[in-house]
């Protein structure tokens, strides 16, 4: 082995770069071509921009599989209903006044 110049970065050492250029082939030989090919092709890691995936939409002719909720009449009193509370207070006052037990 030849002595390596210590001032060179490891990626610039002789023999660190492959003699052939990288290509788009995904065969086993090309996946192990160099470190860059191995990470991109072999491991599937790419740091580029990712495309937006299109959301699958149902065909326009199909209906929603949800039935509308039928309207139901309100049978209970609402918490903000003041007339119902006044009626209840008057009824209670009338009952307490009617007791002659005092």
UniProtKB/Swiss-Prot annotation:
Residues at which Zn(2+) 2 binds: 25, 27, 30
Basic residues composition bias: residue spans: 48-60
Basic and acidic residues bias (residue ranges): 1-10, 90-102
Residues the record lists as N6-acetyllysine modifications: 28, 50-51
Protein name as it appears in the record: Protein Tat
Subcellular location: Host nucleus, Host nucleolus; Host cytoplasm; Secreted
Chain positions of motif Nuclear localization signal, RNA-binding (TAR), and protein transduction: 49-57
Further information: HIV-1 lineages are divided in three main groups, M (for Major), O (for Outlier), and N (for New, or Non-M, Non-O). The vast majority of strains found worldwide belong to the group M. Group O seems to be endemic to and largely confined to Cameroon and neighboring countries in West Central Africa, where these viruses represent a small minority of HIV-1 strains. The group N is represented by a limited number of isolates from Cameroonian persons. The group M is further subdivided in 9 clades or subtypes (A to D, F to H, J and K).
Main localization, broad class: host cell
């Amino acid at each position: 082995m030849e002595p390596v110049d210590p001032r060179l970065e490891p990626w610039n050492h002789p023999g660190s770069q492959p003699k052939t250029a990288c290509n788009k082939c995904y065969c086993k030989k090309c996946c192990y071509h160099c470190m860059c090919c191995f990470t991109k092709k072999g491991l599937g890691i790419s740091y580029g921009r990712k495309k937006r995936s299109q959301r699958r939409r149902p065909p326009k002719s199909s209906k929603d599989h949800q039935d509308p909720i039928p309207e139901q009449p309100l049978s209970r009193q609402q918490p903000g209903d003041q007339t119902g509370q006044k009626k209840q207070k008057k009824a209670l006052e009338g009952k307490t006044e009617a007791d002659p037990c005092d």
